């Protein structure tokens, strides 16, 4: 698979120009933040655009950040991570301040974002229109946090529990349930036989060649954002349908991620259909996880963590200098991944990271 240079050049030119316009609008005087997007030519686009993101591929295989992002519900592979699977919480913790969306310029419709309404700017060429949305809850690249965050262990199969655990212990030594689970009121298989396969639930078509799917019915407890995740050790491509409309593919191709279902009226009934594809002939998952985010509690946590940021006075690719004030015992938390070669100094004295 290859693309013409003209296509590459147009995409990169528009991307670089959009990032340039973001930086003209926001000088980031209050800190260092990340810029991401929900469309990808490659996972290394940010490097080509001159911005900072979480999408990245490297043959050096820094496994720790890949697994960290995977456990938060993002797209991942052996050597890469991709900005797909975001939530309000993960965007805040990772300091993702702006998110870019892409649409067709011929339609002349500004593309929307599932999470954010604050439109910073649009940019276009003859084929595409890009829209940039601002995340009002983005945290700085480093800030003071509770020491109990050092004891946080992220599990493999529930990114909502992981985000609850991480955000809770950034704020204090007490656990807070920001994401709350929604029970499935009905499970409706259509031409699908259920069986057990180790720790997994397995569905296969009863009659091959005919439509085979599993429908999950839930009710929205509040008008807050609702998310979904299906953990599995056996990734077989399926199609997802939200209220009968196509939502996305799932599992294969880096698609075992948190899916944003949206906001609904309180007590509104929501249908999610998982369609088994004819070539795979099965689907296996350990659990069906539906959660909503208590947005009021989440915003309170963000407000607390913003009280003691690292005030950066000098920043480059390999050097960061700043001051931070701690009004109690704690740790300075940063989402810059640790690599051999970094040196940390506190008040001029070398310190070991924890």
Where are these regions (language model features)?
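Membrane-proximal, lumen/periplasm-facing interface regions of secretory-pathway glyco-
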Residues: 2-21, 288, 297-306
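Extracytoplasmic/lumenal acceptor-recognition loop(s) of multi-pass membrane glycoenzymes
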Residues: 2-7, 23-94, 139, 301-304, ...
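Active-site-proximal structural scaffolding
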Residues: 12-19, 28, 83-84, 92-93, ...
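Beta-sheet entry/capping signal
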Residues: 32-35, 97-98, 129-132, 227, ...
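Short, flexible beta-strand-to-coil junctions
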Residues: 39-41, 101-105, 231-234, 276-278
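Short conserved micro-motifs at the rims of enzyme active sites and ligand-binding pockets
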Residues: 47, 143-146, 334-335
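A cross-kingdom signal targeting lumenal/periplasmic-facing segments of multi-pass membrane
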Residues: 51, 58-208, 215-217, 233
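Active-site-proximal, structured, solvent-exposed surfaces of multi-pass membrane proteins
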Residues: 185-354
């Amino acid at each position: 698979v290859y693309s013409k240079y003209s296509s590459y050049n147009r995409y990169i030119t528009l991307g670089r120009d959009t990032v340039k316009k973001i930086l003209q609008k926001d000088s980031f005087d209050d800190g260092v933040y990340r810029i991401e997007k929900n469309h990808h030519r490659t996972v290394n686009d940010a490097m080509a655009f001159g911005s900072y993101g979480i999408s990245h591929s490297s043959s050096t295989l820094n496994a720790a950040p890949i697994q960290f992002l995977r456990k938060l519900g993002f797209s991942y592979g052996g050597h890469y991570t991709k900005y797909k699977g975001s939530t309000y919480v993960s965007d805040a913790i990772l300091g993702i301040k702006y998110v870019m969306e892409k649409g067709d310029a011929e339609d002349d419709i500004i593309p929307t974002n599932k999470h954010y309404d604050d439109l910073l700017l649009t940019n276009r060429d003859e084929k595409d229109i890009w829209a940039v949305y601002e995340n009002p809850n983005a945290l700085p690249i480093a800030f003071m946090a509770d020491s109990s965050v050092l004891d946080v262990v992220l599990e493999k199969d529930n990114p909502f529990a992981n985000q609850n655990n991480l955000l809770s212990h950034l704020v204090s030594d007490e656990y807070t349930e920001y994401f709350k689970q929604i029970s499935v009121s009905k499970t409706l298989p259509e031409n699908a036989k259920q069986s057990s396969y180790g720790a997994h639930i397995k569905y296969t078509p009863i009659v091959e060649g005919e439509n085979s799917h599993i429908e999950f019915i839930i009710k929205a407890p509040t008008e807050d954002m609702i998310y979904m995740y299906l953990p599995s050790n056996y990734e077989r491509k399926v199609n997802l349908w939200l209220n009968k409309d196509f939502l996305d593919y799932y599992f294969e191709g880096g698609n075992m991620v948190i899916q944003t279902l949206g906001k609904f009226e309180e007590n509104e009934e929501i249908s999610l259909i998982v369609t088994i594809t004819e070539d795979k002939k099965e689907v296996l998952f350990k659990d069906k996880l539906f959660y909503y985010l208590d947005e009021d509690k989440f915003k309170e946590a963000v407000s607390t963590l913003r009280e003691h940021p690292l005030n950066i006075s000098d920043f480059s690719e390999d050097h960061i200098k700043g001051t931070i004030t701690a009004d109690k015992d704690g740790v300075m938390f940063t989402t810059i991944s640790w690599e051999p070669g970094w040196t940390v100094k506190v008040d001029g004295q070398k310190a070991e990271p924890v």
